[in-house]
Amino acid sequence: MKICLVDETGAGDGALSVLAARWGLEHDEQNLMALVMTPEHLELRKRDEPKLGGIFVDFADGAMAHRRKFGGGRGEAVAKAVGVKGSYLPDVVDATAGLGRDAFVLASVGCRVRMLERNPVVAALLDDGLARGYADPEIGAWLQERLQLIHASSLTALTDITPRPQVVYLDPMFPHKQKSALVKKEMRVFQSLVGPDLDADGLLEPARLLATKRVVVKRPDYAPPLADVATTNAVTTKGHRFDIYSGTAEVSAV
């Protein structure tokens, strides 16, 4: 994948070349998207809109840390949707990991989460965030146990994953209507890189075959159900809904 690769560390240790080789990235000086190695982290920038700043994954500090400490925890909609209740903490495959926010929420309440991400740049950002998170004295120990990254396409990987998870979580990219600064900034940078998930409808069936309990699909409240498969079971919030479908074990047991 072509992208502008920038090293701002000043270290001159060839780390950027190693990163490019690992993730199959090719330097393109003219590309409007830049993957930048700073002294603190790896970040994604939209070069023609520098005011948007850099997008990076940070599990230990910032917004995700605030959400972990002061958010709803088990009361968060995503936790309710996957079925967290009492001592039940399902094993989850997040098949559209993105920047890992929902996966981190689930891991922070005790679920084991395997994140799938097919875009090599996004996978590199996630991997960088995980490496720093794993090394964090406050969250590192449990993060290593509960949150892992698999760089693969969900369309193929969903048939190969073992052991099977109890829940498969899907949050395919869908054009956002919200005007909030954060969504606006992140989505403009993010969608410039990955675009909409045009093949997202193809994820529902393999997800239902893989999950032993349920599949949860996060959708904006104005979006149609994934693959136009309606369900009456959903957890709703102000701007989203989490559509819930049965997994294979439930279907075969009927």
Curated annotation (Swiss-Prot):
Its EC number is 2.1.1.242. InterPro entries: 16SrRNA_methylTrfase_J, SAM-dependent_MTases_sf. One of its GO terms (cellular component) is cytoplasm. It catalyses: guanosine(1516) in 16S rRNA + S-adenosyl-L-methionine = N(2)-methylguanosine(1516) in 16S rRNA + S-adenosyl-L-homocysteine + H(+). Pfam families: SAM_MT. Its main location: cytoplasm. It comes from the Bacteria. GO terms for molecular function: rRNA (guanine-N2-)-methyltransferase activity. It is found in: Cytoplasm. CDD domains: AdoMet_MTases (cd02440). Keywords: Cytoplasm, Methyltransferase, rRNA processing, S-adenosyl-L-methionine, Transferase. S-adenosyl-L-methionine binds at R101, D102, E117, R118, S153, S154, D171. It is an enzyme of class 2 (transferase). Specifically methylates the guanosine in position 1516 of 16S rRNA. Belongs to the methyltransferase superfamily. RsmJ family. NCBIfam families: PRK10742.1. This is Ribosomal RNA small subunit methyltransferase J. The lineage of its organism: Bacteria, Pseudomonadati, Pseudomonadota, Gammaproteobacteria, Enterobacterales. The gene is rsmJ.
